[in-house]
């Protein structure tokens, strides 16, 4: 799958560049991230990247994005009385379809494919690298959200990312660290808030993200 990512991106953005009305921009913001596993809490993280917005006719549009996004979770009292915090950095590619509603609102939904670039966990300030055995490199999910377009250049987006892939596997151990033979799996759950800035706006001053 990794070898397919580059040509897919090339094709998508090449198609967009052929359209006179296609717009390009950058975006960045905050993530409230968690993994749906027992005793997990959300962590505050970030995301940043670029997008291309292509009108398809009427009020319908297609928007591919390429983001660096940090996700993860915090497990309460995981190691005796200490919390365990996971931080995972992904290269994410949302491919959303949407519709303009009125002059300022855009609703969108679509798949998101992510590849894990780095990750680690922290117990009471002590950091460690993630053991590859317990993590999935790839994540696939569904994104849905809404954008409020303040001006032709600036917009605010609220989006929820619902992961389908078990990205983390936690083993159950006793107080001596002995494997008890069980494990728990979890999927990414992320609420995103971002600000978007359009760099180029083609030939049409349309409402865009």
Where are these regions (language model features)?
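Repeated loop/turn-to-beta-strand initiation elements of outer-membrane beta-barrel proteins
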Residues: 22, 59-62, 104-107, 152-158, ...
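Predominantly the C-terminal beta-signal and adjacent terminal strand-loop region
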Residues: 74-75, 139-209
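Residues on the lipid-exposed face of transmembrane beta-strands in outer-membrane beta-barrel proteins
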Residues: 26-30, 48-56, 66-68, 91-99, ...
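Structural signature of outer-membrane beta-barrel domains
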Residues: 31-35, 69-73, 114-118, 161-167, ...
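Flexible, solvent-exposed loop segments that connect beta-strands
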Residues: 37-40, 70-89, 117-138, 167-186, ...
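Bacterial Sec-dependent N-terminal signal peptides
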Residues: 1-27, 195, 199, 209
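Residues that define the transmembrane beta-barrel architecture of outer-membrane proteins
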Residues: 22, 42-46, 87-91, 136-142, ...
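Glycine- and aromatic-enriched membrane insertion/assembly motifs of diderm outer-membrane
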Residues: 40-79
């Amino acid at each position: 799958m990794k070898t397919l990512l580059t040509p897919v991106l090339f094709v998508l953005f090449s198609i967009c560049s052929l359209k006179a009305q296609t717009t390009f921009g950058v975006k960045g913001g905050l993530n409230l991230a968690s993994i749906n596993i027992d005793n997990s809490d959300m962590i505050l993280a970030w995301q940043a990247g670029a997008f291309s917005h292509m009108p398809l006719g009427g009020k319908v549009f297609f928007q591919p994005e390429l983001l660096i996004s940090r996700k993860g979770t915090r497990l309460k009292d995981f190691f005796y009385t200490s919390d365990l915090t996971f931080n995972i950095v992904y290269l994410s590619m949302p491919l959303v379809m949407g519709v303009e509603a009125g002059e300022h609102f855009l609703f969108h939904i679509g798949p998101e494919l992510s590849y894990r670039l780095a990750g680690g966990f922290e117990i009471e300030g002590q950091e460690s690298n993630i053991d590859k055995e317990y993590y999935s490199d790839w994540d696939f999910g569904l994104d849905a959200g809404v954008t409020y377009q303040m001006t032709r250049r600036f917009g605010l987006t609220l989006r929820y990312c619902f992961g389908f892939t078990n990205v983390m596997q936690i083993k159950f151990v006793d107080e001596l660290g002995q494997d008890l033979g069980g494990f728990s799996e979890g999927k990414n759950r992320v609420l995103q808030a971002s600000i978007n800035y359009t760099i180029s706006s083609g030939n049409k001053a349309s409402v865009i993200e």
